[in-house]
Amino acid sequence: MTVKNETIDYSKTLYLPQTNFPMRGRLPQKELELIARWDNMGLYAQLRQQAKDRPLYILHDGPPYANGHIHIGHALNKVLKDVIIRSFQMRGFNANYVPGWDCHGLPIEWKIEEKYRAQGKNKDDVPLNEFRQECREFAKYWITVQSEEFKRLGVVGDFNSPYTTMAFHAEARIASELMKFAMSGQIYRGSKPVMWSVVERTALAEAEIEYHDYESEVIWVKFPVLQADSSDLCGAYVVIWTTTPWTIPGNRAVSYSSQISYGVYEVASTQNDFGPQVGERLLFADALAMSCAEKAKLVLKRLRIISADELKTLFLFHPLKGFAGSYNDKIAMLDGAHVTENAGTGFVHTAPSHGREDFEIWNAYKPLLEQFGIDSSIPFPVDDAGFYTKDAPGFGPNREGGAVRVIDDNGKMGDANKEVINALIKADRLFARGRLKHSYPHSWRSKKPVIFRNTPQWFISMDKDLGDGSTLRSRALEAVSMTRFVPSSGQSRLASMIADRPDWVLSRQRAWGVPICIFANEDGVILKDERVNERILRAFEAEGADAWFAEGARERFLGERAHESWVQVLDILDVWFDSGASHSFVLEDRDDLKWPADVYFEGSDQHRGWFQSSLLESCGTRACSPYKAVITHGFTLDENGKKMSKSLGNTVVPQEIIKTSGADIFRLWVMTTDYWEDQRLGKQILQTNMDLYRKLRNAIRWMLGILAHDEGEKISYCALPDLEKFILHQLFELDQLINRAYDEFDFKKIMRALLDFSITELSAFYFDIRKDSLYCDAPSSKKRKASLQVIREIFERMVIWLAPMLPFTMEEAWLEHSPKSHSVHLEQFRSVPGEWQNGFLAERWRKVRQVRKVVTGALEFERAAKRIGSSLEAAPIVFISNPVLLEALENLDMAEICITSALTITQDVPPSDAFILSDVEGVGVYPGKALGTKCARSWRYTQDVGSDPAYPDVSARDAAALRELQMLGKI
């Protein structure tokens, strides 16, 4: 039967892609629809049910603070965690993600206090537990807000039952962990210089400190020699340098280093009528003497060397000796390893009330100091409001006009520096003065400078013998050595921080937090009574930590011991202890989790924060780490590599990206970064990722469209054409790379590999070659069916591989492909048949593609010269003198592979004008024009067009396809 070919619309006889999967994602709208779908179907519950018998994989969530909307760092962190959770869930694990929130602490207190100030209320007039309840409600509100923001990012987890540090059970467990430290003797009340925020009226941990440039007043001070073995030192001065003049009233010693060369110098001349005068003898480190002379505008003459042995015998007067009738103690010289000759004078003013190293060297020399008749107690020269106390005579409350202030409530320096310097000038003890811009500690909340001040606080000892020969420090260092770190540099970073850190300051003088729920006597001895502890824990479990502050709490908890002289401690715990104890009340106490966690994953700043507090808390109570691995990410900078800041106007708000572009665009950006380093983000970078997304989406869309014609016929591997086997080999290698990279948390490697595969290997190579067969071959074509089978494998594996990274787009694509499926996220990564691995074919096709590259280059040259339009207009002659390449082309249809209508291969010598590429030796191409007639259906030029009289304008292949389609009733 013949058909009049003029009645046929050939475009309707082709197997062209057909899909409802749109080219434009409309992600902001589509993602909301998918979130609603997941909620309605109970996706999280289905994931848990499906995986209940699999081995657990636990990523323990480092809790963000329940205050304000999420920022770009939160979004980055949660997306990375989500990819880990999803990838392990889809690779045979039960990866349950339980989000958490840190709820206690000063920032929330500040918010409530701000509200009070706006209402004209005084916080001190509000009952403590009423204030705490307002803090609790504030945190609860922001947990709800942040939960929705995290879910909008595509994060899947147990948002209906998250953990919070303010839950009654959590507060009870935090208290229980504290009691373990107390009962084992690791907690003590001490007097130590701590970083103190006058603005916030509390001690700060190292993790609560950030460093900013700050301009300080600096002074060089002369300490007169009181006692020396050499007569030439009587009347001489030891000169120190300090950036904190206000600490001079707290001076108790001068430190030097036995590793530094020192000398005795004489003032030879001076430009000043005040300060050091000609003939004065001064002691300096030799390396620093001349720079000090320049500061004082004088000339020094070196008289002699002074040895460390001689220095240690010296005793000095305090530079304020006699001021306000005080400062009459003698000042010892102490040999300290912390002294350097990098700056200053080589002598260090030592005030054990105002510095960690000063405190440590003072305590190390305590027995010797007492032998010298020096009072070794450490004074409290500054109070919590930044005023001098009675321990700073002449500057404290007995001073006419009242106590001088070091720093005020706004974080501004008071008059202390000025008053101390004036006193030194009057005593003729000022050598020189100046100003210095340097890095100085500030509170991370108030952004105001802090001071070191000696305060009574509660501490966890880092170096107490724990009964087995170990200390908390040694246990933690051992645990670090056994932990996996990504990147590996994190291990040495955390280890060095632990090795150098001081004892852990537990106490805070605030209101919103878990109390240090212990009783102690006036000497700081802690009550160790299990019955008292049990009463406290039962109350916390039922009522929360507010029970500690309720009226009658002391009598309630002490019970029959209430008549004894135990004092209830009212300080609250460092919030890092709260989150550091989360492994106990989350990992240990939930049936759906396990202890220890497989991984903790946070920003690199958490080496001094949550990673460290969790490690110390666990090592102190369990002698080992609560995690097996630690992964860190860097910080997000703007497009120019600058820190994001509201004042600079360069912040990127994740909610805006989601609103305008979609969460998957943000997630794609995360997946293309080296997240363990600092990343950059801005409009141009987002645009680049949107372009990548479009290419990826178009490849998926094309596969969906062509698979609309897939009838699911299965062809054995042996029967597949070589090209399909080669593509399956690439899938095999991709599978190996992707699984390995997911294990290594190298998401950029996965995304880059899949983007390259999609754009270079599929769209620009395999799909391009097979489009003619897929569109034009007959329904019964084995080649077409083989290609459809391989594309099905590609599509399903790619979508599953990408699902953890781009959960919205891959869900949309999967549901288009398998409408009856519940969700791609319920799928598992599929095993790859070993027979797909074929190194021989891979090498063969590497050679084939070298030849193809030369042919393609020649055709591009012809197209640019407008000698051809489509590559189908060409019938190139390929000259191959390389026998290895020639052998690789045997039995291959190179015209199809190069997408030309014909192609001739010859071993003849190529003409001089043949097209060549320098990196492919032995191949030349002469781009001849295709002979024959253009097929109206496939657009190929062949000499058999019209060979079937029923279809005079199509090739024999296309005519046969049309006959088969007609026979099947498809046209």
Swiss-Prot record:
Pfam family, one: Anticodon_1
Taxonomic lineage of the native organism: Bacteria, Pseudomonadati, Pseudomonadota, Alphaproteobacteria, Hyphomicrobiales
InterPro entries from the UniProt entry: aa-tRNA-synth_I_CS, aa-tRNA-synth_Ia, Anticodon_Ile_BEm, Ile-tRNA-ligase, Ile-tRNA-ligase_type1, Ile-tRNA_ligase, M/V/L/I-tRNA-synth_anticd-bd, Rossmann-like_a/b/a_fold
Entry's family note: Belongs to the class-I aminoacyl-tRNA synthetase family. IleS type 1 subfamily.
Protein name: Isoleucine--tRNA ligase
Domain notes: IleRS has two distinct active sites: one for aminoacylation and one for editing. The misactivated valine is translocated from the active site to the editing site, which sterically excludes the correctly activated isoleucine. The single editing site contains two valyl binding pockets, one specific for each substrate (Val-AMP or Val-tRNA(Ile)).
Gene Ontology annotations of biological process type: isoleucyl-tRNA aminoacylation
Domain of life of the source: Bacteria
Keyword Protein biosynthesis: yes
Ligand binding (L-isoleucyl-5'-AMP): 602
Residue window of motif 'KMSKS' region: 643-647
One cellular component term from this protein's GO annotations in UniProt: cytosol
Organism: Bartonella quintana (strain Toulouse)
